[in-house]
């Protein structure tokens, strides 16, 4: 089973730039269940809003943005 190559260092660097996490399956390996689990975990959070391309002009094709409205942090999942 493939495991995540996302290190604690890379996560903390992302947090310093104002992001909670940046999960990039194209550049680092994460299992399908890890990515799906993170998305489901955030979707069931009451403050979560899922933005797709039709909701905002800032989303590019193929990007899904999960925004936590009560924080200034965004989590981006690239598929």
Curated annotation (Swiss-Prot):
One of its GO terms (molecular function) is cysteine-type endopeptidase activator activity. Expressed in leukocytes, lung, spleen, liver, heart, kidney, muscle and uterine cervix. Down-regulated in cervical cancer. GO terms for biological process: apoptotic signaling pathway; cellular response to UV-C. Keywords: Tumor suppressor. Coiled coil: none annotated. May act as a tumor suppressor. Promotes apoptosis of cancer cells. This is Suppressor of tumorigenicity 20 protein. It comes from Homo sapiens (Human). The lineage of its organism: Eukaryota, Metazoa, Chordata, Craniata, Vertebrata. The gene is ST20.
